[in-house]
Amino acid sequence: MSPGPHTAQFRGDGALVLVGDEWNRATASHSELPTILMLHGGGQNRFSWKNTGQVLADRGFHVIALDARGHGDSDRAPDGRYTVDTLARDITSVLEQIGRPVVIIGASMGGLTGILAAQQSGPQRVTGLVLVDVVPRFENQGTARIRDFMTRHVHGFETLEQAADAIAAYLPHRQRPRNLDGLTKNLRHREGRWHWHWDPAFVTAAGDDPFAKIEELEQATIDLKIPIMLIRGKLSDVVSPEGAEDFLAKVPHAEFVELSDAGHTAAGDDNDAFSDAVVAFVSR
């Protein structure tokens, strides 16, 4: 059994500080296993990986779960820009600091970031890629629902109960927690209100149109010659069955796992099944 993670800092693009949870750092340099770098989705943070991170650490992997810029405890972008290219530059910088072979596990935004980072860093640096409920040709309706949730509450909540109600409405398939203390990892209390941990500019500032990058992201994925696995939540409205089928036709060497009880937030919705799939993939 590996001890729990410690907090670590990394340098992103432009020396921006990125904060992560890190397991098994002391044994990484002489391990034959790759480092696992876990990248969350938009509006999430490193704590979404806590269970799977611990499972991987218990199996001897050096694991890093990273807060993206403008999320969690990482610095916010001074210019308010959160394009996928900027996020990818952050990750290529982190990969250089890790300095050993890495498998990237990326959910949603983190998966798209991982595609570009893997392409830019090369197969000696990134040796595998897990895409968690994301493909370059994702569903507009599903991503619009995510954006609506994030922008609707940009001015925060009066109480934790209000935040819990908002999450329950957004994720009706999840059980509403009775103890709301865990929400404080996703919220910050200032000026008498609870605000989401992410920079409001992430959803309010002008950024790149993700649909304008479909061709680039798709071609980057096709060009990758490393092992790839797509994990889809069966209840997802972001990756449709047709979208997954199209992806697998274009990236025929990719493996595919579908989690029957999970939606877009697959890592948390069906955590045991998710962790089992990830462990099997990275252990080969």
Please state what every model-predicted region is.
Residues M1-I36, D58-F61, G99, T127, ...:
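Alpha/beta-hydrolase fold catalytic core
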Residues A26, K50-G53, D58, I64, ...:
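Active-site loop/oxyanion-hole signature of alpha/beta-hydrolase fold enzymes
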Residues L33, G41-Q44:
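Active-site glycine-rich loops that stabilize anionic/oxyanionic intermediates
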Residues L39-G41, R232:
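The conserved beta1-alpha1 loop
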Residues R100-N140:
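Conserved hydrolase catalytic core segment
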Residues E158-A212:
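Conserved alpha/beta-hydrolase catalytic His-Asp/Glu region
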Residues R190-A249:
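Conserved serine/cysteine hydrolase catalytic core
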Residues L259-S275:
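Catalytic histidine-centered segment of alpha/beta-hydrolase-like enzymes
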